[in-house]
Amino acid sequence: MEHLLINETPYALEEQDYEMTLLRWLRERHGLTGTKCGCNVGQCGSCNVIVDGKVRRSCVLKCKTLLGKRITTIEGLARGEKLHPVQESFLACGVMQCGFCTPAQVLTVVALLEANPTPTREEIDKAFKGVLCRCGSYVRVLKAIERAAAILRGERWTDENGNDPDRVIGNSYNMPDAVDKITGRLKFCSDYYFENQVYGKLVFAEYPHAKLVDIDVDTCMALPGVQYVQCYKTTPITMVGPLQKDMPIIAYGKVRHVGEVVAIVYADTQEQAEYAASRLKVTYELLQNVLSVEQARISGAP
């Protein structure tokens, strides 16, 4: 039996998993959910890991291509409660927001500083372009990188105003879940796995304004593994909203923008859900588009 070396520990790789992506194998087979699934097409960087010293997108790496390579995930950085200097710097500089992309950010910085202990701001920017942060905490990330680089070189760092992030007086206390975010221990909804769980795939509207004429639920339900198709034909209308409950969970009657959810397909596996969602036939009647404020203000605008 072959093995993959993850965080200096060999993990058995079953033959049926050779074609599995490293991302799914880490998360589904071994519960290493610190590696996050963002776009799943190798673009956003949320799934970054270090392979033989270089940052790689685990969502597009097949397990069979990684035999004999050293792989580091966020779970392999800290030594017990002792954090890696990069993790410590992220804490000291208050980088974390939601924490979803934080593990990928940390690993990207670790690989950068191992290859280049004295990166310039331009080199930092170039290395960090591959990790998209939906919270936008890039300025603090830059400070954390500069601080970590200095510490790894045995130097003390202060910011451009001469402030030391390690000071006690006048400094902010870490958010309660900061360490869990920085180590990848914090779990998001998709990080939980349950016995007999089903997987869902959203189906999005293709048009900015259209009437929903029909959704072919029966044909989709006949596909392998499909358990349920949630749409206006199968589910009572449910309204949600932060102040007023005036927005349907899924489209009813018509769609009002490209990307509005028109259905959710549930199946036994993620692959079955994705395939069935791609085959779900939605029939639209196109309506006049309203693409500007001026158009929307016209009396009787659709």
What would you call each of these model-derived segments?
Residues 150-302:
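Flexible, low-hydrophobicity surface segments
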Residues 1-161, 179:
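Signature of N-terminal electron-transfer/Fe-S-associated modules in redox systems
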